């Protein structure tokens, strides 16, 4: 469920407040939960089962968005505040909403930067893990992953709208080269309800 007022917002796994909110400019400060993690016990791979778990983490985020007739450009940076990876992420994207037969269709293109500490925590393999699992030790550097997202929405009343979205992300070389990762592309899907004040 997404909720937005003149002063605060709740979207997905992020909540925060508006430091600036005008028709053209928005500056937001928020906290989000990044659910990326790895539970070795759930793996079907015998060697992966011998790795350490990777936990999800909380991020403090600063986001700026500029809106015009050409669409919206958004830039954000977030830092791990839970002491898991101690890394950070940065995202820059463009998006524009189109009305199509009563539905909203919003394409979005962007790039996601993930720091060395972030990548190494989630995708690196220590020498101790390598020794007990048989997987090659791996130390990840920072990387950039481009992505495309398509969002569809429909207003069902003055206050409520529903939406669904799909994301395709090309994994950075630093991520896809990890022995923990099988594949070059990550897919994501989501749906929800938005409440408009």
Predicted regions and their residues:
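Outer-membrane beta-barrel transmembrane domain signature
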Residues: 81-162, 167-176, 180-183, 195-197
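Mid-chain, structured segments of secreted extracytoplasmic proteins
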Residues: 13-48
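Surface-exposed coil loops of outer-membrane beta-barrel proteins
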Residues: 1, 18, 39-60, 133
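Structural signature of outer-membrane beta-barrel channels/translocons
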Residues: 1-6, 20, 65-69, 97-99, ...
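Repeated loop/turn-to-beta-strand initiation elements of outer-membrane beta-barrel proteins
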Residues: 7-10, 25-27, 70-73, 102-105, ...
């Amino acid at each position: 469920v997404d909720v937005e007022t003149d002063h605060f917002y709740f979207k997905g796994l992020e909540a925060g407040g508006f430091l600036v909110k005008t028709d053209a400019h928005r500056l937001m400060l928020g906290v989000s939960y990044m659910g990326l993690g790895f539970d070795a016990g759930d793996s079907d791979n015998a060697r992966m089962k011998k790795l350490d778990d990777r936990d999800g983490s909380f991020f403090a985020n600063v986001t700026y968005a500029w809106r015009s007739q050409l669409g919206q450009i958004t830039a954000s940076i977030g830092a791990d505040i839970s002491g898991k990876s101690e890394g950070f992420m940065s995202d820059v994207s463009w998006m524009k909403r189109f009305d199509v037969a009563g539905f909203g269709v919003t394409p979005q293109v962007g790039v996601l930067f993930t720091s060395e500490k972030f990548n190494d925590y989630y995708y690196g393999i220590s020498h101790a893990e390598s020794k007990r699992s048989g997987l090659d030790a791996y130390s990840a550097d920072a990387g950039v992953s481009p992505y495309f997202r398509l969002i569809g929405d429909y207003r069902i009343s003055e206050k409520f709208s529903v939406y669904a979205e799909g994301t395709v992300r090309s994994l950075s070389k630093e991520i896809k080269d990890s022995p923990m990762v099988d594949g070059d592309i990550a897919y994501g899907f989501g749906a929800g309800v938005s409440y408009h004040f």
